[in-house]
């Protein structure tokens, strides 16, 4: 009668939440990590208006809501809203009873310890899960690419990090984190579109700009040359129709926006670009393993989906590395979901089953158990 109970895999990103069942090859539910609350007083009685909306429903009613993201830079900043998102994931998206399934959650490396303790506490105390585990996002991406050695450059909506992994072990001293990711690029695009005379200010309008970014932006192989091309001809211009039917045209903004990944000074940040961060991460590793990292540089996360990003990374890292070094940038087509896919693989391995933190262990040790059991 022993029926295999599938584990749930939830990759809570700053921008999108990916959820589904271990063993599946793609997440069942992908929805924005947003909680929306009405901006105005309801006047029509019996409309069944709610005091909060989550995910796609919040997105579709965004014109009358104030949208908030409870996860900023990979760290949960509003636990009440986070609980709403998890509740929505279990009961509305996956339609499961959380008390019947082990749950695998993900988090960004170098997150505050309190963050994963609180995640653990909510899973066991609010949702009564039988078991749970918290995995590092980048490690899962490497699993998904079928490797045990490599450096993962994972860039999502809230945080970018480079994680060197050797024979399955993440090398914590060489992990670097950059708080520059998709949301900052969206904000930057809002700013440079304003310079063109289009005004985007509200939280709802930010979502429109995010869509423009996802559909039209790309990474230039040579930024200066691309700027010259854009100035001398209109070949790079594209138009976009806003929800109200107005059509806007964007030109050099298409590649100026993601260029900030390579030149954070565009955003007034003093950090290194993603290419230098990746290189610095490799240089913090033992000299003997660098060759393997250069040859296995894996891109993951939604912010690596820009056309041209892999070629540009190849060019930039080749310029930084020793001249004889073989450099290979791996950009799997499913990299938007590779963290989730890696989680699905991990949670369905027979060898992983002893790794879960059980409710019993939690009851004996409290939330701090998560630091001992999860890497």
Curated annotation (Swiss-Prot):
Note: In vertebrates 3 main groups of actin isoforms, alpha, beta and gamma have been identified. The alpha actins are found in muscle tissues and are a major constituent of the contractile apparatus. The beta and gamma actins coexist in most cell types as components of the cytoskeleton and as mediators of internal cell motility.
Keyword hit for Cytoplasm: yes
Pfam family, one: Actin
Entry-annotated residues carrying Tele-methylhistidine: 73
Listed result of changing residue 316 to K: In DFNA20; uncertain significance
UniProt modified residues of type N-acetylmethionine: 1
Covalent crosslink: (Microbial infection) Isoglutamyl lysine isopeptide (Glu-Lys) (interchain with K-50): 270
Entry's EC annotation: 3.6.4.-
Modified residues (N6-methyllysine): 84
GO biological process, one term: protein localization to bicellular tight junction
Covalent crosslink: (Microbial infection) Isoglutamyl lysine isopeptide (Lys-Glu) (interchain with E-270): 50
InterPro entries per the UniProt record, alphabetical: Actin, Actin/actin-like_CS, Actin_CS, ATPase_NBD
Enzyme class: hydrolase
PROSITE patterns: ACTINS_1, ACTINS_2, ACTINS_ACT_LIKE
Stretches that traverse the bilayer: none
Family: Belongs to the actin family.
Subcellular localization: Cytoplasm, Cytoskeleton
Protein's job: Actins are highly conserved proteins that are involved in various types of cell motility and are ubiquitously expressed in all eukaryotic cells. May play a role in the repair of noise-induced stereocilia gaps thereby maintains hearing sensitivity following loud noise damage.
GN (gene name): ACTG1
Subunit structure: Polymerization of globular actin (G-actin) leads to a structural filament (F-actin) in the form of a two-stranded helix. Each actin can bind to 4 others. Interacts with TWF1, CAPZB, cofilin and profilin.
Methionine (R)-sulfoxide modifications at: 44, 47
Name of the protein this chain belongs to: Actin, cytoplasmic 2
Catalysed reaction, written as an equation: ATP + H2O = ADP + phosphate + H(+)
């Amino acid at each position: 009668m022993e029926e295999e109970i599938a584990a749930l895999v939830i990759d809570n990103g700053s921008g999108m939440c990916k959820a589904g069942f271990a063993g599946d090859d793609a997440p069942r539910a992908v929805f924005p990590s947003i909680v929306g609350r009405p901006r105005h007083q309801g006047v029509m009685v019996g409309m069944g208006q709610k005091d909060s909306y989550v995910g796609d429903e919040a997105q579709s009613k965004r014109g009358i809501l104030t949208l908030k993201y409870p996860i900023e830079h990979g760290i949960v900043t509003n636990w009440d809203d986070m609980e709403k998102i998890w509740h929505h994931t279990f009961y509305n998206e996956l339609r499961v009873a959380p008390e019947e399934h082990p749950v695998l959650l993900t988090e960004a490396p170098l997150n505050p310890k309190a963050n994963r303790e609180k995640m653990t506490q909510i899973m066991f105390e609010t949702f009564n899960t039988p078991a749970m585990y918290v995995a590092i996002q980048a490690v899962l991406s490497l699993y998904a690419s079928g490797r045990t050695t490599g450096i993962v450059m994972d860039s999502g909506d809230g945080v970018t990090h480079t994680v060197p992994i050797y024979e399955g072990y993440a090398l914590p001293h060489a992990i670097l984190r950059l708080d520059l990711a998709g949301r900052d690029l969206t904000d930057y695009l809002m700013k440079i579109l304003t310079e063109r005379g289009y005004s985007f200010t509200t939280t709802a309008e930010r979502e429109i700009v995010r869509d423009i970014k996802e559909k039209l932006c790309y990474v230039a192989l040579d930024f200066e040359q691309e700027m010259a091309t854009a100035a001398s001809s209109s070949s790079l211009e594209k138009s976009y129709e806003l929800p109200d039917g107005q059509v806007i045209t964007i030109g050099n903004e298409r590649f100026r926006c993601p260029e900030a990944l390579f030149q954070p000074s565009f955003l007034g940040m003093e950090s290194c670009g993603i290419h230098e961060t990746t290189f610095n991460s490799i240089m913090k590793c033992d000299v003997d393993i660098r060759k393997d990292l250069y040859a296995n540089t894996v891109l993951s996360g939604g912010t690596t989906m820009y056309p041209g990003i892999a070629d540009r990374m190849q060019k930039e890292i080749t310029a930084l590395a020793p001249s004889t070094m073989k450099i290979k940038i791996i950009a799997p087509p499913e990299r938007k979901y590779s963290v989730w896919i890696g989680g699905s693989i991990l949670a369905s391995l027979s060898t992983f089953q002893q790794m879960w933190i059980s409710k019993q262990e939690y009851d004996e040790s409290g939330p701090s158990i998560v630091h001992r059991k999860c890497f």
